């Protein structure tokens, strides 16, 4: 233990020491902040000023007028001079007056720089301010042209690099907005000034000025017309810009390359009506690139070559065909250097060329095909991961573009590529197999699928494109051989896409593959059954089940000797994938088979073979489950349905086990198979047969123990069939149903069932039938039987819900009668009927006009009371109706605020009624405040809040609960300024709550306090509440502090992980659209500055990194072999190189991440305290009334658990408050109490020390600590093992 007062070793060097005699000084040596403060109080700063001699000189010259703007400018660039003498002058001005009040929007970005500490930004601000003052002093209007003239004059006068950079930056901004005629007229003088600066600054140490001058020159060239490019001076200036694309400094080089791209792609005349196919400077640009590459192509580092390849990557699609060919030949030549980076850049250039999809004048089909053929000589090794991935991507884009240009030629090349790409599935790298699979999928979708219909039938003996398709399929089919067994999952995915793309036309050549797949599925322990089922399913979808079953018969006919059924797995596959096929095939093939199997099952059941009978019964049921798929967009409804209809009717009527399936098939056929008028008419013709059967089934009572699902399916089928049934037939059914309802002999169940049918029939009847129906059900609206009354209101609801047709016309013509009926039946409405009744009123209120305001006013008391109904549906409907009434009042009046106030006045009397009425009225006002928060006046909301605060003094819990809900919504809705006036009132009202109320609503009060403390601070809320609330407030502050700290730690952990993974993140590709090229973003500087160091480190690692793959056996490597380039690897060969990082997510078979969402995202947000305003208001509304009680209880329990605090003080910290809890050693729970060693305990795992798999331990810093702990754990185990071994040896030695 060290001596008292002695610092730990290594600390003394870090501390600042006092000089002798200054140990009592308390003021710091530096006073930077004090000086900054003094400068704000009109005193001169004592420190070094940023004002330079050049800035003073420039300011003096501008003020003295020696840099006049009109001497050498054209008339259109001069400023208008006011001949009259000005009799007013500016009373006061500062150094930056011209900046702060600059009226030109071009420099709005610069106005943000004045607060910056950067010297460059301050220089820009100073120059802009000076130039603006000069323009104003000469009577200018601060146009872009005037700024251009002033800045050009200033550029010739400045001397320091900082001022030159500032002027160039401002010119870069203003040049984009200067009219093109001005720039064309002043091209000679302006370009000469730029070229002089470029030549002077070319070897300068500073890069800023040169970068912005290069950007200005590019903008100037872009604005020239086509005629100007015919002059030698224009090309000479352009070549000056082009020469900087190989500059040694990256920022300058990048600015020049960006400028060249913007000139070739974005010149103004390239977007005109008579735009040339290629820019006039494209030829010289291509020749320059080729010349530079050939000049430096043989050097070791190939730096210039890389620079030119970077430029070519963007420029290649802009060249004419001849130059594209020359450039491509140059690219292919430099790829023979086997330089890793050069090859990668060349591949990027080819990728961009094909991805741009240029016109045939740039890339013809023949040249595209020649490049594709040449790239086969540069296939990387299968062990070379990144180059092989790049090669596959380039070939994918090349073939897609080739097929776009010439279909037959492209398909001819695809056959060879498929053979090469399939061999990539043998690569030891899973990424290569996944990339090859994805590449072939894209080619099938982009190149084959769109053209397969034009190609026609594909057979083995065909020639031309069908032959190419056959070769491609054979290459993929070869993947089913055993040598590809590790990649069978990828092969099956490819086969599925192939079936989907070409199955309809190419099924003759695919039948053998289907047989192979079925045989493969029967092989023992086959691991990819799901992928195989998907592939066969794709074949079923595209070819149809008829073709698939011809290739692989089902082999089930009811006469089997064994019960193996090896191909029964086809039935679920067909069920899940069959669609758009012949419905007649089900009638002719599957229906007889199902009948045979059912008869076989019945025979076996009679013979006592129960198990065999069940198997055949299951098979026939599986066959029937295929029917909904066959009814999904069938191709022969008109021809086949009549042969199937009788069987379906019989099955519905006599086969309860098939009822749900057949009803589903009918619904699917009507909704998805009757789009054609002929098909619709054919199915509608059988409505008179199906609907009576369905009516009868629905009218039958459910037997004890049976499920209600078949009955619901029957009713849904009735509703669906009625959509295509003729109105005359519907009227006849409705008349019969009405008679059944009125029949005194009908039982209650029958009457309720028939009323359900009437509900379904009503919307499809004509107006006369609906009128008659209304007269029939009107007495039932006041029925004593609650179920009948509810059904009657349901009928009325369906009629009122129709927005058009006979039902809508009936509502309009009988509106007064409906209003009277609904008002008269108000007192006799039972609780179960409230929901349909309220829905009727919702539909009616939507159609009302201003003269019906009294009707709405009469409904309000009932609707308010319904907000406390037992049924959640009734409560929701009541709130919806309240909102609709509000919208109705808004329709009635011109002034929305007054109209809403008139509506609220009708609700206010409820606040003076009985307890239930008061509670319901507060709930209604809460909901209206939430819905119409933007339309209610501030005074209205404040008045409501004051009245609700008075109601907090109520002794009834319901009233207090509703009042607290209102306050919670008001806190979220109201502006903080207006809410602040009433904080004291709210807090006083809450403070006067009784102990019982405070205890009962503790969680609601806690939530309110949290919201108030977040808005107004802890001290204010604490000062307004009595002492008994202070403990709760302190707990809230602690919980908020903990939550904030937890969020900060989580954020820090995330940032730390991102920093560690930064090096492995892929570089985001820059956009290559013309808009992005022309947007000269200043943000690129900072990004480039950050990324440059990382890129240099990466280049240093990758430069000259290559490996040679030795020859087989003892044979030496032959360097004269033309294919020796394939043995130059960019990746170190051999497995096990490097470690795979675990990113916390599972990977699928093709390498994609499997990310599962959290089960309850809202709960996470609540724990973090980051809920938005919308979520707060929604929670407040749900908390007010609409949520179910079970959900509220569960949330309350969660909140109480979350907000629970430790009951007593726990030691911690440092010194005497060090942590007292000892950390349990791994495996301590298995240690024996009396003897040595471990013991196995009941209900636990074996006695080992288990190391938890914690993802956070993958952190580089924490990993070392874990390794040390693990080593200690292993050593302890070894010591225990040795001790046990010695004891056993002693025991053996004893006699």
Swiss-Prot record:
The modification Phosphoserine is found at residues 49, 72, 97, 1050, 1073, 1081. Residues 1054-1066, 1074-1088, 1173-1182 have a biased composition (Acidic residues). Signal peptide: none annotated. Its main location: nucleus. Residues 1285-1295 have a biased composition (Basic residues). GO terms for cellular component: cytosol; nuclear membrane; nucleolus; plasma membrane. Pfam families: RRP12_HEAT. Residues 1089-1098, 1153-1172, 1230-1240 have a biased composition (Basic and acidic residues). The modification Phosphothreonine is found at residues 77, 88. The chain crosses the membrane at residues 904-924. It comes from the Eukaryota. Disulfide bonds: none annotated. It is found in: Nucleus, Nucleolus; Nucleus membrane. This is RRP12-like protein. Belongs to the RRP12 family. Residues 1-47, 1047-1241, 1273-1295 are annotated as: Disordered. Keywords: Isopeptide bond, Membrane, Nucleus, Phosphoprotein, Transmembrane, Transmembrane helix, Ubl conjugation. It is a single-pass membrane protein. There is a cross-link at residue 71 (Glycyl lysine isopeptide (Lys-Gly) (interchain with G-Cter in SUMO1)).
């Amino acid at each position: 233990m060290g001596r008292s007062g002695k610092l730990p070793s290594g600390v003394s060097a870090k501390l600042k020491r006092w000089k002798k005699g200054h140990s009592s000084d308390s003021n710091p040596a530096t006073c930077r902040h004090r000086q900054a403060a003094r400068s704000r109080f009109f005193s001169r700063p004592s420190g070094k000023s940023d004002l330079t001699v050049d800035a003073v000189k420039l300011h003096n010259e501008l003020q003295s007028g020696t840099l006049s703007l009109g001497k050498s400018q054209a008339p259109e660039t001069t400023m208008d001079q006011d001949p009259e003498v000005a009799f007013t002058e500016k009373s006061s001005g500062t150094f930056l007056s011209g900046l702060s009040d600059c009226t030109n929007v071009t420099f709005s970005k610069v106005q943000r720089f004045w607060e910056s500490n950067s010297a460059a930004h301050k220089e820009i601000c100073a120059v802009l301010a000076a130039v603006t003052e000069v323009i104003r002093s000469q009577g200018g209007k601060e146009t872009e042209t005037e700024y251009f003239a002033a800045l050009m004059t200033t550029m010739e006068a400045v001397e320091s690099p900082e001022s030159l950079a500032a002027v160039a930056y401002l010119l870069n901004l203003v040049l984009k907005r200067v009219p093109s005629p001005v720039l064309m007229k002043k091209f000679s003088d302006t370009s000469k000034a730029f070229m002089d600066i470029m030549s002077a600054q070319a070897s300068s140490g500073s890069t800023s000025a040169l970068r912005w001058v290069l950007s200005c020159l590019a903008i100037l060239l872009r604005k020239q017309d086509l005629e100007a490019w015919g002059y030698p001076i224009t090309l000479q200036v352009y070549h000056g810009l082009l020469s900087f694309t190989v500059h040694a400094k990256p920022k300058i080089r990048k600015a020049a390359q960006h400028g060249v791209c913007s000139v070739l792609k974005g010149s103004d005349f390239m977007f005109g009506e008579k735009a040339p196919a290629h820019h006039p400077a494209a030829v010289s640009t291509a020749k320059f690139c080729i010349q530079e590459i050939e000049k430096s192509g043989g050097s070791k580092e190939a730096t210039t070559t890389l620079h030119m390849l970077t430029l070519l990557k963007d420029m290649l699609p802009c060249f004419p065909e001849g130059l594209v060919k020359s450039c491509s030949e140059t690219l292919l030549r430099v790829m023979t250097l086997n330089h890793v980076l050069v090859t990668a850049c060349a591949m990027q250039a080819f990728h961009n060329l094909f991805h741009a999809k240029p016109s045939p004048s740039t890339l013809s089909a023949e040249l595209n095909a020649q490049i594709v053929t040449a790239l086969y000589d540069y296939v990387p090794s299968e062990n070379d991961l990144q180059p092989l991935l790049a090669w596959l991507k380039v070939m994918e884009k090349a073939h897609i573009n080739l097929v776009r240009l010439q279909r037959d030629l492209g398909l001819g090349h695809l056959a060879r590529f498929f053979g090469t790409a399939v061999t990539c599935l043998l690569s030891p790298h899973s990424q290569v197999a996944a990339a090859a699979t994805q590449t072939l999928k894209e080619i099938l979708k982009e190149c084959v699928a769109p053209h397969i219909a034009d190609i026609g039938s594909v057979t083995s003996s065909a020639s031309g494109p069908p032959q190419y398709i056959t070769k491609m399929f054979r290459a993929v089919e070869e993947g089913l051989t055993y040598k590809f067994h590790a990649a069978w999952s990828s092969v099956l995915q490819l086969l599925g896409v192939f079936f989907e793309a070409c199955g309809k036309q190419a099924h003759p050549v695919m039948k053998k593959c289907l047989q192979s797949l079925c045989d493969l599925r029967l092989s023992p322990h086959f691991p990819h059954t799901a992928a195989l089922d998907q592939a066969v399913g794709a074949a079923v979808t595209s070819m149809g089940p008829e073709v698939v079953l011809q290739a692989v018969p089902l082999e089930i006919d009811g006469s089997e000797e064994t019960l193996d059924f090896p191909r029964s797995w086809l039935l679920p596959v067909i069920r899940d994938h069959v669609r758009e096929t012949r419905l007649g095939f089900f009638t002719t093939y599957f229906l007889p088979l199902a009948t045979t199997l059912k008869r076989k099952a019945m025979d076996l059941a009679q013979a006592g073979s129960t198990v065999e009978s069940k198997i055949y019964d299951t098979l026939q049921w599986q066959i029937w489950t295929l029917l909904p798929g066959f009814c999904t967009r069938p191709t022969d409804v008109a021809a086949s349905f009549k042969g199937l209809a009788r069987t379906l009717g019989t099955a519905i009527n006599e086969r309860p086990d098939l009822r749900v399936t057949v009803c589903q098939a009918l619904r699917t056929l009507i909704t998805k198979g009757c789009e054609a008028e002929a098909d619709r008419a054919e199915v509608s013709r059988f409505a008179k047969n199906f609907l009576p059967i369905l009516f009868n089934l629905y009218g039958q009572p459910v037997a004890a123990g049976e499920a209600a699902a078949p009955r619901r399916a029957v009713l849904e089928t009735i509703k669906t069939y009625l959509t295509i049934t003729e109105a005359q037939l519907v009227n006849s059914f409705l008349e019969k149903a009405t008679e059944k309802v009125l029949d005194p002999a009908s039982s209650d169940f029958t009457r309720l069932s028939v009323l359900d049918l009437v509900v379904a029939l009503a919307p499809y009847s004509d107006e006369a039938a609906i009128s008659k129906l209304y007269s029939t059900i009107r007495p039932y609206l006041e029925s004593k039987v609650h179920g009948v009354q509810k059904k009657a209101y349901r009928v009325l609801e369906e009629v009122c819900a129709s927005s058009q047709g006979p039902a809508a016309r009936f509502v309009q013509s009988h509106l007064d009668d409906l209003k009277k009926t609904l008002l008269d039946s108000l007192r006799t409405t039972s609780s179960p009927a409230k929901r349909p009744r309220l829905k009727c009123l919702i539909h009616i209120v939507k159609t009302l006009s201003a003269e019906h305001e009294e009707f709405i006013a009469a409904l309000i008391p009932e609707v308010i009371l319904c907000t406390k109904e037992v049924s959640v549906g009734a409560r929701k409907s009541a709130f919806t109706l309240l909102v609709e009434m509000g919208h109705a009042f808004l329709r009635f009046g011109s002034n929305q605020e007054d109209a809403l106030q008139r509506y609220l006045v009708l609700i206010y009397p409820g606040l003076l009624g009985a307890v239930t009425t008061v509670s319901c009225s507060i709930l209604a006002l809460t909901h209206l405040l939430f819905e119409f928060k933007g339309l209610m006046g501030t005074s209205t909301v404040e008045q409501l809040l004051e009245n609700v605060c008075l109601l907090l003094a109520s002794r009834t819990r319901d009233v207090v609960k509703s009042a607290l809900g209102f306050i919670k919504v008001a806190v979220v809705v109201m502006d903080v300024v207006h809410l602040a006036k009433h904080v004291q009132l709210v807090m006083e009202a809450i403070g006067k709550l009784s102990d019982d109320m405070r205890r009962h609503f503790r969680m609601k009060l806690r939530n309110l306090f949290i919201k108030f403390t977040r808005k107004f601070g802890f001290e204010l809320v604490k000062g307004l509440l009595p002492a008994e609330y202070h403990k709760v407030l302190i707990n809230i502050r602690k919980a908020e502090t903990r939550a904030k700290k937890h969020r900060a730690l989580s954020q820090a952990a995330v940032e730390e992980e991102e920093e560690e993974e930064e090096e492995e993140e892929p570089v985001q590709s820059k956009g290559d659209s013309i808009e992005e090229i022309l947007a000269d973003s200043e943000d690129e500087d900072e990004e480039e500055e950050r990324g440059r160091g990382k890129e240099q480190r990466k280049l240093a690692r990758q430069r000259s990194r290559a490996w040679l793959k030795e020859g087989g056996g003892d044979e030496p490597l032959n360097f004269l072999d033309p294919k020796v380039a394939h043995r130059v690897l960019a990746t170190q060969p051999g497995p096990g190189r490097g470690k795979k990082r675990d990113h916390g997510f599972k990977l699928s078979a093709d390498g994609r991440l499997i990310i599962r969402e959290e089960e309850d995202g809202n709960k996470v947000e609540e724990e973090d305290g980051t809920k938005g305003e919308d979520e707060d208001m929604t929670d407040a509304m749900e908390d007010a009334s609409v949520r179910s009680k079970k959900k509220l209880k569960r949330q309350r329990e969660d909140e109480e658990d979350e907000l629970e605090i430790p009951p007593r003080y726990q030691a911690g910290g440092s010194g005497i408050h060090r942590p007292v809890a000892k950390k349990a050693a791994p495996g301590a729970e298995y240690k024996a109490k009396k003897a040595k060693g471990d013991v196995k305990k009941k209900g636990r795992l074996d006695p080992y020390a288990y190391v938890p798999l914690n993802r956070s331990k993958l952190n580089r810093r924490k990993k070392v600590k874990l390794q040390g702990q693990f080593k200690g754990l292993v050593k302890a185990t070894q010591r225990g093992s040795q001790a046990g071994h010695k004891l056993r040896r002693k025991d053996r030695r004893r006699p």
